[in-house]
Curated annotation (Swiss-Prot):
It is found in: Cytoplasm. This is RNA chaperone ProQ. Disulfide bonds: none annotated. The lineage of its organism: Bacteria, Pseudomonadati, Pseudomonadota, Gammaproteobacteria, Alteromonadales. One of its GO terms (molecular function) is RNA strand-exchange activity. It comes from Shewanella pealeana (strain ATCC 700345 / ANG-SQ1). Belongs to the ProQ family. The keyword Chaperone applies. Its main location: cytoplasm. Residues 127-141 have a biased composition (Basic residues). Keywords: Chaperone, Cytoplasm, RNA-binding. Residues 117-126 have a biased composition (Low complexity). Residues 107-153 are annotated as: Disordered. One of its GO terms (biological process) is post-transcriptional regulation of gene expression. SMART domains: ProQ (SM00945).
Amino acid sequence: MESTEKLTDTNAILAYLYETFPLCFIAEGETKPLKIGLFQDLAERLADDSKVSKTQLRIALRRYTSSWRYLKCVKAGAQRIDLDGNACGELEQEHIDHAAATLKESQDKAKAKRVAQAKSANPAAKTAKKPVKKPVAKRPKPAQSSKPAKEPVVAENLTPAVLTELKPNQRVNVKLGKAPVAGVILDIKKEDVQVQLDSGLTIKVRAEHILL
């Protein structure tokens, strides 16, 4: 005894219709508008076919006729066809306008969805960059920027540094002109000491120009 498995997947049912009615349901390329009332003809033609139910046929037919490929074929001058591919009259303008409106609405929804997805992805990228930029923006504006002008008051208590006493990240004063300027040692290479002043300026000086 042979048992026929009922098709439930819409794509599988469409594939079955492409195979059974190739002149009506076109799998690839430009389609043709279907005859009004074609569902009834389809149900009668497949009444003895246990593979598909009327409900599944209706769903598959709706999927086929709502696709962009089908809606694009509903245009002026096109002929409707029956299950055997026979012409059944030209389309009415009302149906052409309805198909065009449905196609535009569907395409607009798809476009809006793509835009929304793109926007939802961009904020994440922007917020990921902000934490990196914040520390850089704060560096040029240290709270101590107004203090260097007052440092000369204690200049009498400062003494020239010895190279061996210096180390990176150490707070020091650099002798520039008449008044020493406060800063932080960034790096020491041989006899050259790189210092970042509180003003944000980075300079390279000899150890004898550094005061402690």
